[in-house]
């Protein structure tokens, strides 16, 4: 157990306020937040003068060590969480994808992910489970895995990757009905996989084989249409829905429309979509272009990143993730001659906190309190771990970042901590640097050096029925009860 720790002279930032205060940590928990805490000899002292003391980031969207199509993502749970803490993130929510098509149950897939993660993680983590096929036993398995014993409160549905991960509309609707019963959140990758497949065939037949084919096979309307459809299906099932990696204006507009109709919809843009655009797919260097291949692709509209940040500021979008899913140059090169074979995925877990500060706070679009909301607090609320996570307060876990808003760093693959030979943010200069990262009261990053211990992070059960998501569910359910007309025979 780490010694007691006192953070002196900093400015505490929560989603609802900023104030000067010291912070005392004992046994991994914040035990006091007040001015001028007296440091005792046995305490470790951190001087946070001119620094912000913020909740550790929560990245709600990662794919560490994920097997897919014969490849495995390069960031395993060790390197991925090392990269996370180096950037100021102290918890990830990773996606577990059971091999449904070979008969693997949700529980068996969950156990496989836990066996990979538990010995390696350097920060806390939770799991979200993908449902890629509906079977007669799926509903029962969903009920089991949302129990406190397993601690899963969300399920992911892919509307893309036909033949592997994609679910049909009827399967997703049936699963959303079960989510509603279990008070579990539906999370959706919104694309039209059937149309994409046909467009891929057409493009290849016309000789389009390079990475530019990836974005051409996925027009922005495809994401907008699927986002709207996911929201419609969720509304019919009375199921709150969370749209992952919102990349385009049309998808964001669909979310805003359904929220205006009273639906419970959350939108998650990612660091890549807030900083980059799709011009990279047309780079003359094949490998450069391939490195940016992800789904949905980056927007071809260069004004989209700023608009997404403004929608975060306005509350029309709600939190930020990364979709950290790393494949190196050799893996990307498997798609030479056929863009559909390029593994989809990019980095982000290390750079999200700086990128969001640069594009949001330093650009004058959001304030530091909104920054905390979209990088940690809202995720903690959605996944039912607030205020244990996502807040600097007595009783909260001591997941804390000493953040220097005035420092700068230039992102580079030469200095990052990913197990990756490139960085999609290469050369971007960011204001806002996580100088010290504290996980459960233990310093894991300081002075530009990792101080991590594999396995020191813990699995955090994510319990169903988050009040932030489901507090109005029963009332909504009653309003949706069918009407029966009594008629004289």
Swiss-Prot record:
CDD domains: D-HYD. Its main location: nucleus. Pfam families: Amidohydro_1 (PF01979). Its EC number is 3.5.2.2. One of its GO terms (biological process) is pyrimidine nucleobase catabolic process. It is found in: Nucleus. Substrate binds at residues 161, 295, 344. Its cofactor is Zn(2+). Zn(2+) 1 binds at residues 61, 63, 156, 323. It catalyses: 5,6-dihydrouracil + H2O = 3-(carbamoylamino)propanoate + H(+). Carboxylation allows a single lysine to coordinate two zinc ions. The keyword Zinc applies. Binds 2 Zn(2+) ions per subunit. Keywords: Hydrolase, Metal-binding, Nucleus, Zinc. GO terms for cellular component: cytosol; nucleus. The modification N6-carboxylysine is found at residue 156. Zn(2+) 2 binds at residues 156, 189, 245. Belongs to the metallo-dependent hydrolases superfamily. Hydantoinase/dihydropyrimidinase family. Homotetramer. This is Dihydropyrimidinase 1. The lineage of its organism: Eukaryota, Metazoa, Ecdysozoa, Nematoda, Chromadorea.
């Amino acid at each position: 157990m780490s010694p007691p720790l006192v953070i002196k002279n900093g400015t505490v930032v929560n989603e609802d306020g900023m104030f000067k205060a010291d912070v005392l940590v004992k046994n991994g928990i914040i035990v006091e937040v007040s001015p001028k805490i007296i440091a005792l000899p046995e305490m470790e002292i951190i001087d946070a003068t001119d620094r912000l003391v913020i909740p550790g980031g929560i990245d709600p969207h990662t794919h560490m060590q994920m097997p897919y199509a014969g490849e495995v993502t390069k960031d395993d749970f060790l390197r991925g969480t090392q990269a996370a803490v180096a950037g100021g993130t102290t918890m990830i929510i990773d996606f577990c994808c059971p091999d449904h098509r070979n008969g693997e149950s949700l529980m068996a897939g969950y156990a496989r992910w836990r066996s990979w993660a538990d010995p390696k993680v350097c920060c806390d983590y939770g799991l979200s489970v993908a449902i890629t096929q509906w079977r007669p036993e799926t509903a029962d398995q969903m009920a089991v895995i949302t129990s406190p014993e397993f601690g899963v409160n969300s399920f992911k549905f892919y509307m893309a990757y036909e033949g592997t991960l994609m679910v049909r509309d009827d399967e997703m609707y049936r699963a959303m009905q079960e989510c509603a019963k279990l008070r579990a959140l539906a999370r959706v990758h919104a694309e039209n996989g059937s149309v994409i497949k046909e467009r891929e065939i057409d493009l290849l037949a016309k000789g389009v084989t390079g990475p530019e084919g990836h974005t051409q096979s996925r027009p922005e309307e495809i994401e907008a249409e699927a986002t709207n459809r996911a929201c419609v299906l969720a509304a019919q099932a009375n199921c709150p829905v969370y749209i992952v990696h919102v990349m385009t204006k049309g998808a964001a507009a669909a979310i805003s429309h359904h929220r205006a109709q009273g639906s419970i919809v959350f939108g998650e843009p990612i660091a890549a979509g807030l900083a980059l655009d799709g011009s990279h797919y047309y780079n003359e260097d094949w490998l450069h272009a391939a490195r940016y291949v992800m789904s949905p692709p980056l927007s071809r509209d260069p004004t989209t990143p700023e608009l997404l940040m403004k929608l975060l500021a306005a509350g029309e979008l709600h939190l930020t993730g990364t979709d950290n899913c790393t494949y190196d140059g050799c893996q990307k090169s498997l798609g030479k001659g056929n863009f559909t074979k390029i593994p989809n995925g990019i980095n982000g877990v290390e750079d999200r906190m700086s990128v969001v500060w640069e594009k949001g706070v330093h650009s004058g679009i959001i304030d530091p309190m909104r920054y905390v909301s979209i990088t940690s607090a809202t995720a903690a609320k959605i996944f039912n771990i607030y205020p244990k996570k996502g807040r600097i307060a007595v009783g909260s876990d001591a997941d804390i970042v000493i953040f220097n808003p005035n420092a700068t760093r230039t992102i580079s693959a030469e200095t990052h901590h990913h197990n990756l030979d490139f960085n999609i943010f290469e050369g971007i200069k960011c204001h806002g640097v996580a100088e010290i990262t504290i996980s459960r009261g233990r310093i894991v990053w300081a002075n530009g050096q990792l101080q991590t211990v594999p396995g020191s992070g813990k699995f955090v059960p994510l319990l169903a029925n988050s009040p932030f998501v489901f507090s109005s569910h029963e009332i909504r359910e009653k309003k949706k009860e069918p009407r029966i007309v009594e008629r004289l025979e």
